[in-house]
Swiss-Prot record:
<dbReference type="InterPro" id="IPR034733">
    <property type="entry name" value="AcCoA_carboxyl_beta"/>
</dbReference>
<comment type="pathway">
    <text>Lipid metabolism; malonyl-CoA biosynthesis; malonyl-CoA from acetyl-CoA: step 1/1.</text>
</comment>
<keyword id="KW-0276">Fatty acid metabolism</keyword>
<comment type="similarity">
    <text>Belongs to the AccD/PCCB family.</text>
</comment>
<keyword id="KW-0275">Fatty acid biosynthesis</keyword>
<protein>
    <recommendedName>
        <fullName>Acetyl-coenzyme A carboxylase carboxyl transferase subunit beta</fullName>
        <ecNumber>2.1.3.15</ecNumber>
    </recommendedName>
</protein>
<feature type="binding site">
    <location>
        <position position="51"/>
    </location>
    <ligand>
        <name>Zn(2+)</name>
    </ligand>
</feature>
<dbReference type="GO" id="GO:0003989">
    <property type="term" value="F:acetyl-CoA carboxylase activity"/>
</dbReference>
<feature type="zinc finger region" description="C4-type">
    <location>
        <begin position="29"/>
        <end position="51"/>
    </location>
</feature>
<dbReference type="GO" id="GO:0006633">
    <property type="term" value="P:fatty acid biosynthetic process"/>
</dbReference>
<dbReference type="GO" id="GO:0005524">
    <property type="term" value="F:ATP binding"/>
</dbReference>
<dbReference type="GO" id="GO:0008270">
    <property type="term" value="F:zinc ion binding"/>
</dbReference>
<keyword id="KW-0862">Zinc</keyword>
<keyword id="KW-0479">Metal-binding</keyword>
<keyword id="KW-0443">Lipid metabolism</keyword>
<dbReference type="InterPro" id="IPR041010">
    <property type="entry name" value="Znf-ACC"/>
</dbReference>
<comment type="subunit">
    <text>Acetyl-CoA carboxylase is a heterohexamer composed of biotin carboxyl carrier protein (AccB), biotin carboxylase (AccC) and two subunits each of ACCase subunit alpha (AccA) and ACCase subunit beta (AccD).</text>
</comment>
Amino acid sequence: MSWINRIFSKSPSSSTRKANVPEGVWTKCTSCEQVLYSEELKRNLYVCPKCGHHMRIDARERLLKLLDEGSSQEIAADLEPKDILKFKDLKKYKDRINAAQKETGEKDALITMTGTLYDMPIVVAASNFAFMGGSMGSVVGAKFVKAAEKAMEMNCPFVCFSASGGARMQEALFSLMQMAKTSAVLAQMREKGVPFISVLADPTLGGVSASFAMLGDLNIAEPKALIGFAGPRVIEQTVREKLPEGFQRSEFLLEKGAIDMIVKRSEMRQTLASVLSKLTNQPSPFVEPELISEDE
């Protein structure tokens, strides 16, 4: 090594500059890999301004951005999961719960609230994918049922945002039972004529897609969301065939009639308000343009 190389090898330039950038200031888009300013991304509801990719968004933040400011009130916030089976795989289930709670600041994978949307009363729920993949266990099922019962009590619509890998395997049959439990309460809602809208975000899979997520009076999806029971890789390995382009993405499902609408996150609030006003026979929160006759 020459003397000049030795001097430059000791220079703190690159490593120091890198260390001086606070963590979390920049975020790389998981689709186009553009480096984005995190605050701008947050203002854009975690949708990449370069390519339009819908990244995962925190469940609580999603609901607070949806509801009218100051109108939210959480439902069943005290419910916490318990390791009834003393389940252990690579780690103890209770250790996984503790780690997820520490990482997310939430007690489980579903957040439920009441509030208003353009002054319309509404009950909302959202899966937190960061909490054990948004998996559905006993607490998720119980909170979903309590939210649905609250909607029937208030006679107002219920909107649920799903982003889940499916049933929580660490709870075995207790988690599978939630599929029947959540489906049963939605049947009660239907009998009472209370609207339920399901919004499917990326990903919505397994026992969640096989139960409440696909049982909406209206099933809406975010763009390019992965929706299905088993994932595409598992299906390819099982059938040993190449799957069609875009298989299990929301655009593919809309084309095949499995969902009703695809709505961008930036347009979700207005779209839901417009749809719910029609379903509940209330005046539209938006000013409709007046039709001008040719005589005027």
